[in-house]
Amino acid sequence: EDERAFLGGVYYEAYKKMGAHPMVMNGVAGTHFAVWAPNAVRVSVVGEFNNWDGRALPMHKMPMSGLFELFIPGVKAGDAYRYEIKAKGDVLLQKADPYGNRTQPAPLWNSVVADVSDFTWNDSGWMAERKKYDDRRQPVSIYETSLGQWKSGKELVAFAKEKGYTHVELHPVMEFLEDGSDGYPTSAYFAVSTRYGTPAEFAALVDELHQVGIGVILDWSPAQFPRYAGGLEKFDGTPLYEVKDPEMAVHPMWGTMLYNYDSPMVMDFLISNACFWLEVFHVD
């Protein structure tokens, strides 16, 4: 059923299946990995836990969807990893996890296993009211900022509350490679940038803002992605996430790659990413 939804472009909770998820399976603690690479000959999970050896932990392919998955006992939150993808022609690629919830600090890009559910929320009142909120009939005052401009989240909360803002709009908090880009373009869509702390620390900021009656809006960049060795470009050796026509795939001004919106699986990736921030981190 998950495979059919994924192939149909309606798997809006793909983030619950894809990526790296610490769990206990049959009484054994470890991490479950899942990645989409339909044209790959082989996909392996590599990390310090197997000396970065792609021969050690090959993943199992689901033929209908091109998803690869594997449960690895003993792998835990904090362990760095990436995918070694053997493409056609015996080309070996090293790729970050598109659905990864944490990365090493830029300019490094290896993914890091993280448990983003490990946070206790205290904003139930806000979340209940959010379902009834109609911004077309309510006064709105939005403060736009970047987390990098603040020494601490508490200072931002205090400032926004004092000035009477109803919402805070944050420049992208997702991971990005270039320090001068202010978050554009995004390199890891499901990961809070290490520049801004841990997933739990970002969740705490959203929680505190909600508790004082302030909503959280995120800038989101689903139009383009950066070109780097571990990125989405030719992820399995073929144009998987980007526009298939090479003459149309690169943004003429910025040199970034443009998403292929005709692909249901790319739409899964982008829409589930929006749902991820709304559901997991309670953004508004």
Predicted regions and their residues:
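Short, solvent-exposed S/T- and G/P-enriched segments that are highly enriched in secreted/extracellular
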Residues: 56-57
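Short proline/glycine-enriched turn/loop motifs at strand-loop junctions of beta-rich domains
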Residues: 36-43, 52, 75
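Substrate-binding/active-site clefts of carbohydrate-active enzymes
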Residues: 104, 124-142, 146-283
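Short beta-strand elements bearing conserved aromatic residues within extracellular beta-rich modules
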Residues: 43-45, 81
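The feature marks proteins involved in alpha-glucan
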Residues: 1-32, 60-144, 149-152
